[in-house]
Structures are given as C-alpha cells and as structure tokens.
Amino acid sequence: GLGDVYKRQEESGVEKGIVYVITEHTTTGITVNESLPCVEKDLMECLDRIAPEDYPYHHNHYLPTYGTIGGNAPGHLKSLLTGNHCVFPVLDGTLKLGHAVDIYFCEYDGIKNRRYMVYVVGERG
C-alpha cells in the first residue's frame, strides 16, 4: 500500500476534507482493494487475461515522437482499467478507509522510477 498517504494527511493538519492520490504515468494505476496476496494475484491474473502481453496491439510500432517502438500497450490498457487516482474523506483528522481497504500503486510496464502525487485539501483544526 501507499503508507505515506497516511503520513501526508497527518502532517497536513487537515481535520475535515479529502485526500486525493494520482499517478503521474499512463502505464501505472492507483486502485483500492483488500490487502491480501490472493486478491492481488487474482487482480493481476484478471488484467493479464483482458490485456495479454502477446496480443498484436496497434501501439506496438515505431513511434517517431519517442524514437522507439511502443511495446507497452498492455500497460496502458491495464492502467485504464484500474484507474489513475483515488479520493478519500478526512473526518476528525482521520483518513477514512474501510476496515480491509488499502491503496495500491500498480506498475504495468516493468520496474521503473515512478511517482504519484498526494493532495490533502480541507479545513485545519
């Protein structure tokens, strides 16, 4: 999960508001789900069935603007399916997530140096 989301909210001093988490990349996702290895595995297997690596995607050709072959179409599609952001309420100075809820940063294009942004907006105590 994204443990520093809690830290950022606490440091903000916001008592009532929202926390907004968004990725900066088009082949990553931000999603919310139960924090269990079996759920993570099921999610990835489902996404692999929907957007398999070996499909002949239109994106897998030379892209002059990038000077390379776009071989990451499955990553773009998986990102669309999981989404690129999530929003949670802050009440009484506490980030409100369900009992078994965790926030996931999902990488769909190999190991890379990636970033996401956390915005905390609201009324301070």
Task: List PLM regions with ranges.
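Short, small-residue-biased leader/transition segments that mark boundaries at the very start
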Residues: G1-Y6
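Phosphate/pyrophosphate-binding loops at sites that engage ATP/ADP/AMP, CoA/4′-phosphopantetheine
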Residues: R8-V19
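C-terminal binding/interaction regions
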Residues: H85, G98-E107, I111-G125
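Divalent-metal (often Zn2+) His-rich catalytic cores of metallo-beta-lactamase-fold enzymes
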Residues: N33-S35
